């Protein structure tokens, strides 16, 4: 069993006899010298999707839930459900839009490296690859000779995500985005 300080985002844990997926973690450090760090976690219950905020001491042991990851590709939208297809055996997995709201900003039709997280036979979330490639739909015109400049400008991507990009990048270009930092990494390989 890992300590609370070792739990990562998107981990499946058991707490109060229920299985949760950790969506966000904030480390709180008390101002007193003897105070131990606290980890405040935003949890989503697997079966109902109910949100819960829980605090754990840094050295508190947390039981991880058994879950499986399967490689998937985005297939289509069915009402409020997003359907992902298993890349190996073509099993469809329906996931509610609210459950993967943050991840949707990085998922386009051709996004590769996605994995569905399955707990007790049901899909509970999507795990993103470290970087994804997306197309810029709108940004200010590029400035010739600006490659030496470190200045940036906002760019809206095909999924609606807005990131800062270097001035020499223009609309229609395909770029790599870090999914953990929400930042521009580089131009995509052609």
From Swiss-Prot:
A UniProt-annotated Pfam family: Elong-fact-P_C
UniProt xrefs under SUPFAM superfamilies: Nucleic acid-binding proteins (SSF50249), Translation proteins SH3-like domain (SSF50104)
One term of GO molecular function: translation elongation factor activity
Entry-linked Gene3D superfamilies: 2.30.30.30, Nucleic acid-binding proteins
GO cellular component entries: cytoplasm
Domain of life (superkingdom): Bacteria
A Gene Ontology biological process term: peptide biosynthetic process
PANTHER family per the UniProt record, alphabetical: ELONGATION FACTOR P (PTHR30053), TRANSLATION ELONGATION FACTOR KOW-LIKE DOMAIN-CONTAINING PROTEIN (PTHR30053:SF14)
Family: Belongs to the elongation factor P family.
NCBIfam families named among the record's database cross-references: PRK00529.1 (NF001810), PRK04542.1 (NF003392), yeiP (TIGR02178)
Identification of the protein by name: Elongation factor P-like protein
Organism listed in the record: Pseudoalteromonas atlantica (strain T6c / ATCC BAA-1087)
């Amino acid at each position: 069993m890992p300590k609370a300080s070792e739990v990562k985002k998107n981990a499946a844990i058991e707490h109060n006899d229920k299985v949760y997926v950790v969506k966000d973690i904030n480390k709180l450090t008390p101002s007193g010298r003897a105070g131990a760090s606290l980890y405040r976690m935003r949890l989503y219950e697997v079966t109902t999707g109910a949100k819960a905020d829980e605090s754990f001491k840094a050295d508190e042991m947390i039981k991880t839930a058994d879950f499986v990851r399967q490689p998937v590709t985005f297939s289509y939208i069915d009402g409020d459900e997003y359907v992902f297809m298993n890349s190996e055996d073509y099993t469809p997995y329906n996931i509610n839009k609210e459950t993967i709201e943050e991840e949707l900003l990085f998922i386009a039709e051709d996004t590769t490296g996605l994995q569905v997280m399955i707990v007790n036979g049901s899909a509970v979330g999507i795990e993103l690859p470290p970087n994804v490639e997306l197309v810029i739909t709108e940004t200010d015109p590029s400035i010739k000779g600006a490659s030496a400049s470190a200045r940036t400008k906002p760019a809206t991507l095909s999924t609606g995500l807005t990131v800062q990009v270097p001035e020499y990048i223009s609309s229609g270009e395909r770029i790599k985005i870090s999914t953990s930092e929400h930042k521009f990494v580089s131009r995509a390989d052609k």
